[in-house]
Each structure stands twice: as C-alpha cells, then as structure tokens.
Amino acid sequence: MADSSEGPRAGPGEVAELPGDESGTPGGEAFPLSSLANLFEGEDGSLSPSPADASRPAGPGDGRPNLRMKFQGAFRKGVPNPIDLLESTLYESSVVPGPKKAPMDSLFDYGTYRHHSSDNKRWRKKIIEKQPQSPKAPAPQPPPILKVFNRPILFDIVSRGSTADLDGLLPFLLTHKKRLTDEEFREPSTGKTCLPKALLNLSNGRNDTIPVLLDIAERTGNMREFINSPFRDIYYRGQTALHIAIERRCKHYVELLVAQGADVHAQARGRFFQPKDEGGYFYFGELPLSLAACTNQPHIVNYLTENPHKKADMRRQDSRGNTVLHALVAIADNTRENTKFVTKMYDLLLLKCARLFPDSNLEAVLNNDGLSPLMMAAKTGKIGIFQHIIRREVTDEDTRHLSRKFKDWAYGPVYSSLYDLSSLDTCGEEASVLEILVYNSKIENRHEMLAVEPINELLRDKWRKFGAVSFYINVVSYLCAMVIFTLTAYYQPLEGTPPYPYRTTVDYLRLAGEVITLFTGVLFFFTNIKDLFMKKCPGVNSLFIDGSFQLLYFIYSVLVIVSAALYLAGIEAYLAVMVFALVLGWMNALYFTRGLKLTGTYSIMIQKILFKDLFRFLLVYLLFMIGYASALVSLLNPCANMKVCNEDQTNCTVPTYPSCRDSETFSTFLLDLFKLTIGMGDLEMLSSTKYPVVFIILLVTYIILTFVLLLNMLIALMGETVGQVSKESKHIWKLQWATTILDIERSFPVFLRKAFRSGEMVTVGKSSDGTPDRRWCFRVDEVNWSHWNQNLGIINEDPGKNETYQYYGFSHTVGRLRRDRWSSVVPRVVELNKNSNPDEVVVPLDSMGNPRCDGHQQGYPRKWRTDDAPL
C-alpha cells in the first residue's frame, strides 16, 4: 500500500505532475511534438474539468489538454510563439499592478507583493481524494504574508489615515533592517518623511496613523531622529513636524511630539519663512514658540513654556537675532484685529518671561541690527504695537517693573503720568526711537507716530528748552554770513589777477569777509558729512527729499572751498564758481522757514515740485526739443563758403544762421525752440528753409505739444502736489519741525545734550530684585473722560504736590516739579477739550494686570454736571 504522505507516482513512460504545477509541464524530459496534435480542439471556456476527471488520479496525458487549451487561446489572441506563453506561465510575476497614479503628490505606480497558495491547496486536495482512508492530518500554517512598502505606498496610506494598511510595516522594516528616516522613504525634492505628510493630511484635526508611526519609530530605535527630521529643500528648510502641528493648531499632536522628544528650538529658515520684502511669505521668527505666538495660540504657548518634558526658552533668538517679541512686531500690520491679538500675546509673553526668568528683560534684547522690539516697531511703522509698548501700564505689583507708564496723581478725569524715556530719548549715547522716527523716511505714517504721547510732548519740551532759542540764533547767524558773502563777492577788484593785494581798509574788510565765508563753508562741509553719512537710514529718498537741505548745504560748502582754492591758485574762473555758491547759499535760507508754521509747508511744496513734477517735465521736454531741433535744422539750407559783399567790396560777411545752416546752428536752434515754448521766439529762419510748409507744420506741432500740452500738464501736476501738501500741511510741518529740533540737538556736544535733557529722575517702585526702581521719566498731563475714576495704580495721592512721600515703606522723590503745575493743568485740559466732539469717547489701551474692581467707570456727562462735580 502506497504511503499516504507521498505524492502520486509516475508510471513507466509517464511524466509525473509536479506539485503546484497546473500546466502539466514535464520535468526532466523534452517537450514532445506530438502534444501539439490536438492544439485547436476546445475553447478557452472549456478549461474546467468535470467532477469525474477531478476525482481520478493524474494520468500520463493529463497535461496535454491544458497545454492544448493554452496554445489555442494564444493563437486566438495573436501570440506569435506559443512557447513564449508557456514560459510566461512558468515565471509568472507575483506583483499585482496598482493604480495608474498614486493619490496626493506621487507620480509613481506601485503594487502589493502576494503569494499564490492555491497550487498547494489543489495538490493537498488530490492527495486527500486519492487516499480517503488515511487519517486527516492538520493543515500546515501558510507562510506569513510580507507586504512591500515604498515611499509612494507609505505616503498614500498616511494621507488616507488608514491604520489597517500599516499592519505589515513594522515586520517589513525589521526584516530588511530599514527605518522610516531612510532616503527611500523620504520625498526626494524636500526630504519630507511620512510624519509631516500625515500631519499635513488631517481629517477633523486627526490622523490615526500618527501614533502608529511614532510607535514603529520607537521600536526601530530612531524616535528622536524621526520626529525631528527637518525639511532639506531651500524653500522649507528646517521645518519639522512640530512646526506643522503648531501651524495646524493641533495641541494634542504638539503634546504628543514634545513628550516623545521633539526639538522645541528647531529653526525653520527656508525661503518661504522669510519676510515678504525678501521674497518670502510668512516670517514668524523660525522657532516653534514664535510660530505659536504669531498664529495666536496662547494655549500652545503656555504648553511649550511650561511642559514637564522640555521647556521652550523664551529668550532664544533666531538667525536674525530676533526673539519672539521681535517676531510679533514683524507680523503686526496696524489693523484693528491684528493689533488686538498681537498686543495681548506680547503682554502674555512679557509677563511669563518675567515670572520664569526674573533676572532677564526680554524687551531689552537686541537683534542683529541692534534693534529692540520697540525700536523695530518704530522703524517699521507699526503704530499699534508701538503705542502699546510705550504706554504700557502694569498694575500687578510683582511685575510692575515692566511698566513704561506710571500715574503720579489723579484728580477726576485729569491725571499726571510719568513715561519711561529709556530707548525713547538717549541723548546721543545710543540710537533712540525719536531719531529713528524723524530720520527714517521709509516710514509712511511717521507723522502719526510722532503725535503719540509722550513723543509729542517731548518734542514740545525740547523746543521750549533749547530749540527755539538755538533756531533763531542760527537764523540770524546764517543771514549775517550770507550778507558778508554777498558784499565780498560784490566788491571784488576789477583789475589784476587773484589773489588780489590788500592795501586799503576796504581790502582788509574784504579779506575778513573772505575768511568768514571760507570758515562757514568748511563748517558746513564737516557738519553735513557727519549728518549725511552717519545717519542710520540715509537712502536715496532721504537724501533728495527729506534731506534735501543737508545735500544743498553740502554742495554749497564744496563750491565755497573750490572757489577759495581757485582764488589762491590765481585762476580767474573762481568767480564763476563763487557766483553759483552765492545763489545756492541764498536758496538754502529756505531751510529756516520750517521754524514757522506759516512758511514751513511752503518749502516742502517747493522741494516736492522740484524733485517730482519738474523733473518729469524736463525729461519729456528735453526729448521733444532734441527731436524737433534735429528735424528742423535738417530743413535749413547749408551755408555757402563764400563771402557776401556790398557794392564797394569793402564790407564782406559770411552767411550764418538764421539765413542758413552752419556748424553752430543746432545749439542756437535749441535756444530758439525754448523761446518759442515760452512765447518769446520768432521765425527768422523760415525764409532759408527748403520746404517751408513742412517746416511750419513741425513748428506748429512742437508748439502744441510743448506750450499747450506739457506746460499745462506741469501746471496741473504742481497744483495736485500743492493740494496734497496742503491737506497734510500740519503733519508735514510737524515732521520738519521735529527734524529741526533733533538737528539742533545733534549739533550740541554730549555735555550740553545732558544739560538740556528733558525729564526727571523718578523712583517709580521696586525692581525685580527688590531694589528701588529709578528711571528717567517724562511727565505728561492728560485727561480722559471715559475711564477717569480707575486710577488705582497712582504713585502720589496728592495732585501736584512737590514733596517727598512714602511708598511701600521707603521714600520716593518726584523732584523738579513745577509749583504752578496744577494751575497749568486746568488751562491745558480746557484746550484739549475745546474743539472736541461731545459724542467722541477716547478709549485707552487696556492696562496689563487684573481687571478693575471699581464699579464707577463713567465720568459725569459732558452736557450736564452736578453742583459738586469737579471742573
């Protein structure tokens, strides 16, 4: 009896059927040609054997019908060689083709590796049917199915969020000793792994494959590398999965990543994350904490700074040296909604840093450009955050040292505030906010920022202390110098060669005038060299519009020095240079018109018309003149090389323009065209033209284009410029006035600057270490009718009292208060409210600290008051 464990045996001359081989291919023998005898019998659909055939043992001819049916189908389908079909069945691929294009951004075809176990099942079925009497042995376990994963497959799975398709990923990685951070699983263009891909494809804020991927990375031993794997392309370089989770506003994934070891100080430095003026799209400060702050996510900010795993350092700076406060200033855009969230986030971070790092002042950190957040707000024109910083008032005693505004005393709606002048007015020791606002012409709204308190009152105080007196002294001095220069030029000797001898009293007076003129020229030269080339932001616009007088003074000084050098060298051409300097010197006297409001805007109109309207007009007009002069001169008859004599042959002349065309006709004709433009020309040359009609047509079109069109366009443009300047005359004059004050202050030596410094040294409270907090502050008397009964954080309870008072156990001296301050406050209040609309309500910025517990939040109505109501 045959052993049941053996397969079917082949008889003599028969070919045994191999297990798992349905085609009946003989093993060890050549393929018989007689097997092709009945090739064309049957159809493709007749491959299924009958139940009787299936139950009988395999015989010697069982493989032939199968071959016959396969070859028959091959001929019907057009296969040229049936043997190729036979070989294709022997080596059939086990990879099932996938879809033509993978989802998302992949362009690769992919498939899944599968094992065909049906052959073994058929072989076992034949054995069981052949020997039914043997006991049924337990079926062997099939080999495990090993899936094949590559980048397109993996990215498709995580994009769909299908955790079931990731079942075979871990065995595949362990079997082939691979990791999810290998290059074959990264996007070639960006270096992106499957974790950022999953975070970018969330459904309702979730993607169930993310925890599975993290678990697989932990089992393969590269969890931190997998989480912190950054983008490597130039566009998104440095971005990690933590950045994406924060940007997607998924706090649960932020917590998961940080708990697993995500780098909370990773820096995204790609081109996409640069400022817009540098070709980027969204600059947020590179760091994850800055991204959470700039996208208004305080809950994530709190977690990053207070989590038990790895806290984000709020003092960390990016590649530009910017902290998270700098980043908030950078994204501010002066809109209401943006300013509201930026200021709240700014206060949150500032207070949190003060509690976590008491010895550090986050607001004092400078970036690579040497700018603090306050200076950066001033330089970029972010008036919302700028006003909030300089007027910040903290009521909490633990963080009161962060205040920049302190209420000294209050009486009804009137209160006196002390503003911290640190960084605002530095007396030349370092760059100040005031200088940035005045000299940086790139700030379009700087006149609005100069109106913010205490900047406005600070400029007034400087003008009262030294600005007005110094300005009028400069006016008188400059006018005297120009009169001396004029007299010196007028009384130049008419005979001889320079340098002229000095013999008489008049000669010695002329010598004194020349020395004074040369001294003023040298003084202006070095002064303007310092002003033009040592300013923080000169720029082209600053030089030719805002700094036009500095440039003109510099040119004037150069002309004076050159004229003096030519005079000493004995060259008579010094006189031509001197007269240009004389004209320019008198024109520069317009600089002093900015000291008066009546004439201040007039000089601004002249500057804008010269550098804007007139420049464009002259450019177009010059092109017209050259074109028409070339055409009209070509129509003139050339001059003959013969003399025209009268009858007596004694007075002979050579014909020249306008009777004909000679070598100097073009330059002379340009002057004639200019005369025609202003209505002073004549047509003497018309008689010497070849085609008078063409000549007249050209002249008429020239007059229409220049005299009628261009001149009227110039007048219209100048009128528009004057109208624009008139609308903003107050702001423009105030800006010029502020520039004049700072120019005068910068001309003083350091000791004079400190002597005329505005403000007073005041002890405003305690520092973070408990020592007295002494600051240089500037006092501003203000009035507020909307929140005037909430001044709970005042320093002095007696309004206008000039004495030493006690505050929390130690003395504080306000110092240098005017005794008549209270008497000066009431007229100031009346002035501020004289022209105001009764319906207008001034809403101040929210103070930092606990909400007020005061129930009386409104003042007296302005249309009535009680008998005991304060004035």
Curated annotation (Swiss-Prot):
- Signal sequence segment: none
Q: Name one GO biological process term.
A: glucose homeostasis
Chain positions recorded as a 1,2-diacyl-sn-glycero-3-phospho-(1D-myo-inositol-4,5-bisphosphate) binding sites: 249-251, 296-299, 344
Q: What is the effect of changing residue 89 to I?
A: In MTD; lethal form
Q: How does it sit in the membrane?
A: Multi-pass membrane protein
Q: What is the effect of changing residue 602 to C?
A: Found in a patient with spondyloepiphyseal dysplasia Maroteaux type
Q: Pinpoint motif Selectivity filter by residue range.
A: 679-682
Q: Intramembrane residues, please? A: 666-685
The catalysed reaction is: Ca(2+)(in) = Ca(2+)(out)
Q: Which sequence positions carry the modification called Phosphoserine?
A: 824
Keywords per UniProt: ANK repeat, ATP-binding, Calcium, Calcium channel, Calcium transport, Calmodulin-binding, Cell junction, Cell membrane, Cell projection, Charcot-Marie-Tooth disease, Cilium, Disease variant, Dwarfism, Endoplasmic reticulum, Ion channel, Ion transport, Lipid-binding, Membrane, Metal-binding, Neurodegeneration, Neuropathy, Nucleotide-binding, Phosphoprotein, Repeat, Transmembrane, Transmembrane helix, Transport
In terms of superkingdom, the source organism counts as Eukaryota
> How is it modified post-translationally?
N-glycosylated.
Membrane-spanning intervals of the chain: 470-490, 508-534, 548-568, 573-593, 609-636, 694-722
Q: In which tissues is it expressed?
A: Found in the synoviocytes from patients with (RA) and without (CTR) rheumatoid arthritis (at protein level).
Effect recorded for residue 333 to G: In SMDK; decreased protein stability; no effect on ATP-binding
The record's region (Interaction with calmodulin and ITPR3) falls at 812-831
* Family from the record: Belongs to the transient receptor (TC 1.A.4) family. TrpV subfamily. TRPV4 sub-subfamily.
What is the recorded name of this protein? Transient receptor potential cation channel subfamily V member 4
Gene behind this chain? TRPV4
